[in-house]
Amino acid sequence: MQRWINNIWYGSNPIKWLLVPLSGLFWLISSLRRKKFAGSPSASEALGVPVIIVGNITVGGSGKTPMVIYLIELLRRQGYRPGVISRGYGVKIDGVKLVEAQASAVDVGDEPAMIVARTQVPMAVGPDRLAAVSLLQRHYDIDVIISDDGLQHYKLTRDIELVIIDGARRFGNGYLLPAGPLREGLWRLKTIDWLINNGGKAQDNEVLMQLEPKPLLKVKSSQPGLESLDKALPVVAMAGIGNPARFFDSLSGQGYQLKHTLAFDDHQAFDAQALIALAGDLPLIMTEKDAIKCRDFAQDNWWYLPVNARLNADFDKALLARLAPLVQIKP
């Protein structure tokens, strides 16, 4: 299903023309939602803590999670105490809940589980993001909120908006849902603070973000293992993310010999026996987000590829300069 949809959004499938009228309806509904919350006070005024949105205007993965981790580490180096909120996509969450250090992706979602496993940041998940902020404030002394996604969640006031785009696929065919991948029109990019280009050629007013691969780690232990994986050996690669081809290309570019590639839907739950059968006796390499969902049944020869976001120092300075006066505002 995901491949068929991507062919409509990023290819030349003529079915998109049948969906354009529905895109008009989507535009009307989303416009009414925006107007409902227009003129809301900033988060630093309304909540007593500034909110940084890390979102996108397209459906699917664009690199938000590495950017969230990058911001957590950047802010901590400057002495800030960030907390993170998320919807927890792919799972049903009643109310809001804190994400514990060893939280299961089944309970909180794969991205929140990965973020906390990597950073141990205070984090809350749930469909009501304002309630998630309140829960964090009751349990932790935080001075900045990072919202993982939520650009279109206008009920949540915000101070800074970062939009991440896939530098290769960009905006697809340029149509709103369901004819295209856009959650909002391209006009929305004129209202944000920074447009982050993940892995493409940055155009005017775009900040380039590169994902730097790190050494492979064992899915079972998140440790390197006694021996590194020999790149001369054939391997199986799998990815359940928005753009699996990007991951496979990254592995090939590092010299791994991909015998088979397995592309799954984003946020897809995995069956242990099915993956064992698909990989056979070959080493299996997956994304860090997928590893979070597989660690309870991982085999000894299963590995994952961590990546770190890298942005230029000018962006860091500009963001910190924008943030500093907001942290001092109290309701």
Curated annotation (Swiss-Prot):
Pathway note: Glycolipid biosynthesis; lipid IV(A) biosynthesis; lipid IV(A) from (3R)-3-hydroxytetradecanoyl-[acyl-carrier-protein] and UDP-N-acetyl-alpha-D-glucosamine: step 6/6
GO cellular component: plasma membrane
Catalytic activity: a lipid A disaccharide + ATP = a lipid IVA + ADP + H(+)
GO MF terms, alphabetically ordered: ATP binding; tetraacyldisaccharide 4'-kinase activity
Top-level taxon in the UniProt lineage: Bacteria
Keyword line: ATP-binding, Kinase, Lipid A biosynthesis, Lipid biosynthesis, Lipid metabolism, Nucleotide-binding, Transferase
EC number(s) reported in the record: 2.7.1.130
Biological process according to GO: lipid A biosynthetic process; lipopolysaccharide core region biosynthetic process
InterPro entries referenced in this protein's UniProt entry, alphabetically: LpxK, P-loop_NTPase
Residues where ATP binds: 58-65
One Pfam family hit: LpxK
Summary of the function given for this chain in its UniProt record: Transfers the gamma-phosphate of ATP to the 4'-position of a tetraacyldisaccharide 1-phosphate intermediate (termed DS-1-P) to form tetraacyldisaccharide 1,4'-bis-phosphate (lipid IVA).
Similarity remark: Belongs to the LpxK family.
Protein name listed in UniProt: Tetraacyldisaccharide 4'-kinase
Organism of provenance: Shewanella denitrificans (strain OS217 / ATCC BAA-1090 / DSM 15013)
